[in-house]
Amino acid sequence: GYIVACIDPRGTAARGEEFRKCTYMQLGKLESDDMIAAAKWLATQPDVDVKNIGIWGWSYGGFMSSLCIMKGNDIFTTAIAVAPVTHYKYYDSIYTERYMRTPAENERGYEDNAPLNWADKLKGNLLICHGTADDNVHVQNTYELAERLVQANKQFDMAIYTNRNHSIFGGNTTL
């Protein structure tokens, strides 16, 4: 059987302004810490197989799943990252600068939680999926992460969907 948990880490809505805004200038840091802590708590539950704890996400969720399997490589054994942001320097500046300011103003915020910079920490199974026509999270994010993983001699799986956009929809597309 399967157990599925949906975690609302710091930065999500419905828990007050301080909880929602605490990720400002450090996207990924607190959220990944919370996801890793939640997975570690789940691992203490009697029906959870600690050797098979996975995480998956799409877009920002892909950013989180790729970061979590690298930062939380002692708890997550598998991750699926679909259309992941792997470094905010490659993402839409209107969105990014609203939450992170510019790279010149917040270099540590950009670098410290970029999955690219954690690639050498990968231990488990990672599947990365991306459409080449994604105009939201450009496929460069995936290509750069793949290059870092190769340079770190890490095994991973990758599925590239030619001419598919951010939703990877249409034709015989399957994930």
Segments and roles (model prediction):
Residues 1-60, 86-87, 91-97:
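Cap/lid segment of the alpha/beta-hydrolase catalytic domain
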Residues 22, 34, 77-78, 84-124, ...:
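Mobile cap/lid helix-loop segments that gate and shape the active-site cleft of serine hydrolases
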Residues 62-74:
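Short glycine-enriched nucleophile-adjacent loop
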Residues 122, 128-130, 134:
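Short beta-strand/loop motif that positions the catalytic acidic residue
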Residues 127, 143, 150-175:
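C-terminal catalytic histidine-bearing segment of alpha/beta-hydrolase fold enzymes
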Residues 132-135, 163-165:
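Acidic beta-to-alpha connecting loop that harbors the catalytic carboxylate
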Residues 135-144:
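Conserved alpha/beta-hydrolase "acid-adjacent" motif
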